[in-house]
A protein has these predicted regions:
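Radical SAM/AdoMet-radical enzyme domain recognition
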Residues: 1-72
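Auxiliary Fe-S-binding modules of radical SAM enzymes
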Residues: 60-64, 71-213
């Protein structure tokens, strides 16, 4: 189970979410663990001037509870379209901050497969931490993922500007074979890269909150 938690501070949580529900998230994590929905994985995004100093505390908190933490570079998927690469906390910065408090040993690249996160053993293990460097070290070459949105659209990339409509096909009585063929076509239509570094890059109209996972 994946849960987003960018901060351990309730006030910072409110700044980020405009909701006073930090404790609800913590209670939900505990309930998930009690119900056996393991492993519990947390995703965190560090933002300059907001929570950039929380990396070591977040990792220590997760290690105490047996959660696996993954830091994700902030991507151009915000609803306000205000993403600025110069203000992004990079994977290198994240690792520098963590290395000041923990001994990090990189796991062999052969164990990564198509997973988006690079992983490190923390203080010799068994605890681990992952970093998803979607911007500075993109993993497009090995990506085998697509996403299905809540309104029935298949996206072949988070940064895709087009979608494959499965909802209309379902409502028209398409069988499993036709749906699979449409999805397969979308998968094979994946571009070689997301193109974030290209001058022609266009931020998707859908923010991350409307894409889902």
């Amino acid at each position: 189970m994946n849960v987003s938690l960018d901060t351990l501070d309730p006030d910072t949580f409110h700044t980020l979410t405009r909701r006073h529900r930090h404790q609800d998230v913590l209670d939900g994590l505990a309930a998930a663990e009690a119900a056996g929905l393991t492993p519990v994985k947390l995703n965190a995004v560090l933002m300059r001037g907001v929570n950039e100093d929380e990396a070591p505390a977040l990792l220590a908190w997760c290690l105490e509870r047996g959660y696996e933490l993954r830091f994700i570079e902030q991507m151009p998927l915000d609803a306000q379209h205000g993403w600025d690469r110069s203000s992004m906390i990079t994977a290198e910065e994240i690792l520098d901050r963590l290395s000041a408090s923990f001994d990090l040993t990189p796991e062999p690249s052969t164990t990564r497969g198509a997973a988006p996160a690079e992983r490190w053993l923390v203080d010799g293990g068994p605890g681990r931490v992952g970093v998803i460097a979607s911007v500075t070290r993109p993993f497009c070459r090995a990506c085998d993922r697509t996403r299905l949105t809540a309104d029935g659209q298949v996206r072949d990339c988070l940064f895709a500007t087009g979608e494959t409509d499965l909802r209309s096909a379902l409502r028209s009585g398409a069988d499993d074979a036709e749906l699979a063929a449409r999805w397969r076509t979308a998968m094979w239509g994946k571009k070689a890269g997301a193109g974030i570094d290209s001058p022609e890059f266009h931020q998707p109209d859908r923010p991350m909150s409307a894409i889902g996972g």
